[in-house]
């Protein structure tokens, strides 16, 4: 056994990469309370104070502090970088994306036009030399995609029935198992990949075999470059980490290699708390670490995650507002044996929100079960109430599918750590698809014949029997063009923007999932309900085109625990997912879908016309799986019950639900509020629901923040939105108004 593995137990993980087995053999669960936690050290306060000042400067400059224009980002493109002059000794975790804090790298491999536009948007002049290289000599992902797009694909993209496609930015959602760097050292990982290369292709050299051999070689090169990057900071990561500080640093170098080479829409950290706790506990036993020092290590690691930045273009920022990176980091959960996997370090990660205040990043995610230790549930609820910075996902529905060593690879999507990768698929606008079923495929905004020219509804009333066959046909068409478009995008991403650093830390024999998504979900449900249970009259313009709907009579709405509406919701999810499954998916990946919109529900709504449920043209779509605005009439619990009916097995990419609760609705004091929130989550997740964003504040606070963003208390005021967290002052005015328009529950 290597000297770095002293004190560790188990044998199965010694000779092959087996992170789960190592964790199961060595972690100590913790059932106690939060009284052991320590306040920030002097070094933490000083560094975080410097970063807060840099964030103020960044905001004053319009959202970007500094941007690279002359150097193409790579693992070794820069020398060592630190938070400030003379802070090297203060930083217990080192490493920056560039040479300066909050400076955004130049990443042209996804698309040179986008990289240059990101520069010019904020007043920076891109390099003429790099422009020549990436237009004449080096093809990019974006160029490859648009070279191969069919006219139909361009048409659906232009008309926004397929939205947010990863054809102008890195796809993200690939989580390298960064723990491997710490446990095994990079030399061991190189040797394992070299074995895979030797065993690949002993026979016919098919296209797939040739491509895989090239990819493994690229992964080996990435691992070697990872060592060079660490050496720039004075570290040798060839061998395993020797203590907790090294384990955290080694792991961070793995993550840093990813964010230096990719600008994916989600660059998740993964499930690291239990793993790191093993090293911290060993250091405690050896007498080389105190609790204050352990918390400082976690604080400094989280500080680095809070600093991750990418250069983005305006159209991207409209879709994903507030500068998110989805450095998603999970805590808690149960083992396959039913035992709690909560450790002291799970508390420590949540405690960073107290030591350094609220923050959108990392995207802290509690893998929730009603069987988690009471003290941990209470502490998580306490932090949610005070910071609105945590999301919760149901470990009891994910664990049977993904095991007990999975990560969240984006907003809410699970992936088995080190074993799987996901092809990100953005969203199909089913709300617009519904209007196409009525108009015969003609877009209400552009008047293009975007969808198939099926026979429109020609009468003055939308009848259920006339509408449903048309809607089914239109969804079938949309599912087909959606999958084909994504197949093309991911082929080109693999070819021109391959994630070698991340995939080097994932098994070569990787399982791939093919993510799709649904936008406008609740509006489609309520519109079908209106057509079925009420009378929907069509109002036409002078050309006879259906421009508006007038609904007579009442109809059940999703979000009120009414099975008449909720059954339609379940039907819609199952039907669309089954349509997706009919089609061939790239590299034999397994299709999934999500009900998730991010903040792009505002942009999607702009391009969507009037709907039978009463939603006006141009208004934001309801986010994720949330009920339509104004639909919830029976309180929070009824709304949660409706969402809980959606079957997770048909939406393995995730079902996002965001709720805002008035503090007074939870109770009159902290103890009551914590108890009530834990009770709500226990009941919600025991019903099989997948996800919950928890915001605890009143609308008055949002309005005051919008009107007075200069107040110090609002500098890091964080809220949960569909799939992530964001500083409220970083949203556009339009998006702020959208958040304010959503229901803040004043009662259960």
Describe these PLM feature segments:
Residues 2-748:
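Conserved catalytic cores of very large enzyme subunits
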């Amino acid at each position: 056994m290597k000297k770095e593995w002293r004190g560790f137990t188990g044998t199965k993980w010694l000779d092959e990469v087996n992170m789960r087995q190592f964790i199961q053999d060595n972690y100590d669960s913790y059932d106690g309370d939060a009284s052991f936690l320590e306040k920030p050290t002097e070094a933490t306060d000083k560094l975080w104070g410097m970063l807060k000042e840099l964030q103020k400067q960044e905001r004053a400059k319009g959202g970007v502090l500094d941007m690279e224009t002359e150097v193409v980002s790579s693992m070794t493109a820069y020398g060592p970088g630190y938070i400030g002059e003379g802070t090297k000794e203060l930083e217990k975790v080192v490493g920056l994306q560039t040479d300066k804090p909050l400076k955004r790298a130049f990443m042209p491999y996804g698309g040179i036009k986008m990289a240059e536009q990101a520069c010019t948007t904020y007043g920076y002049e891109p390099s003429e030399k790099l422009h020549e290289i990436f237009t004449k000599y080096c093809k990019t992902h974006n160029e490859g995609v648009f070279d191969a797009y069919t006219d139909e694909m361009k048409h659906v993209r232009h008309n926004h029935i397929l939205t947010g496609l990863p054809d102008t930015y890195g796809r993200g959602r690939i989580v390298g198992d960064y723990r491997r760097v710490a446990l095994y050292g990079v030399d061991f990982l190189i040797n394992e990949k070299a074995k895979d290369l030797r065993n690949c292709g002993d026979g016919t050299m098919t296209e797939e075999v040739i491509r895989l051999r090239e990819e493994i070689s690229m992964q080996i090169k990435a691992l070697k470059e990872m060592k060079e990057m660490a050496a720039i900071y004075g570290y040798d990561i060839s061998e395993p980490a020797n203590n907790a500080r090294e384990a955290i640093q080694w792991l961070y170098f793995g993550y840093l290699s990813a964010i230096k080479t990719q600008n994916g829409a989600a660059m998740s950290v993964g499930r690291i708390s239990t793993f790191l706790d093993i090293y911290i506990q060993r250091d405690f036993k050896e007498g080389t670490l105190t609790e204050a020092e352990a918390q400082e290590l976690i604080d400094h690691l989280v500080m680095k995650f809070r600093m991750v930045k990418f250069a983005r273009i305006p159209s991207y920022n409209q879709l994903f507002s507030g500068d998110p990176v989805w450095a998603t980091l999970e805590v808690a959960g149960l083992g396959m044996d039913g035992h709690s996997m909560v450790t002291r370090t799970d508390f420590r990660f949540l405690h960073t929100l107290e030591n350094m205040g609220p923050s959108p990043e990392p995207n802290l995610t509690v893998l929730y079960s009603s069987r988690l230790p009471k003290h941990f549930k209470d502490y998580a609820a306490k932090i949610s109430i005070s910071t609105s910075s945590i999301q919760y996902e149901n470990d009891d529905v994910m664990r049977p599918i993904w095991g007990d060593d999975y990560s969240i690879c984006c907003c809410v999507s699970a992936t088995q750590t080190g074993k799987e990768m996901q092809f990100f698929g953005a969203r199909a606008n089913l709300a617009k698809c519904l209007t196409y079923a009525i108009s015969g495929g003609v877009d209400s905004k552009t008047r293009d014949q975007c969808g198939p020219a099926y026979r429109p509804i020609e009468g003055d009333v939308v009848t259920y029997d006339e509408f449903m066959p048309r809607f089914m046909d239109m969804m079938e068409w949309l599912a087909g063009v959606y999958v084909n478009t994504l197949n093309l995008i991911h082929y080109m991403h693999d070819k021109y923007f391959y994630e070698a650093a991340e995939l080097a830390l994932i098994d070569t024999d990787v399982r791939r999932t093919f993510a799709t998504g649904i936008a406008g979900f609740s509006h489609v449900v309520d519109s079908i309900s209106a057509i079925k249970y009420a009378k929907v009259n069509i109002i036409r313009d002078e050309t006879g085109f259906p421009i508006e709907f007038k609904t007579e009579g009442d109809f059940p709405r999703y979000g009120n625990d009414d099975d008449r509406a909720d059954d339609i919701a379940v039907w819609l999810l199952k039907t669309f997912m089954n349509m997706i499954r009919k089609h061939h998916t790239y590299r034999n990946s397994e299709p999934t879908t999500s009900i998730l919109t991010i903040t792009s529900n505002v942009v999607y709504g702009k391009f969507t016309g009037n709907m039978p449920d009463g939603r006006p043209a141009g208004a934001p779509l309801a986010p994720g799986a949330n009920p339509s605005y104004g639909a919830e009439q029976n309180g929070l619990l009824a709304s949660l019950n409706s969402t809980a009916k959606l079957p997770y097995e048909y939406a393995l990419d995730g079902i996002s639900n965001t709720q805002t609760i008035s503090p007074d609705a939870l109770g009159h004091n902290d103890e009551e509020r914590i108890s009530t929130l834990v009770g709500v989550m226990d009941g919600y997740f025991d019903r099989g629901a997948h996800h919950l964003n928890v915001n605890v504040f009143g609308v008055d606070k949002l309005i005051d923040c919008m009107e007075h963003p200069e107040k110090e208390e609002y500098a890091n005021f964080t809220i949960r939105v569909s799939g992530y967290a964001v500083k409220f002052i970083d949203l556009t005015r339009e998006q702020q108004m959208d958040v304010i328009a959503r229901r803040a529950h004043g009662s259960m």
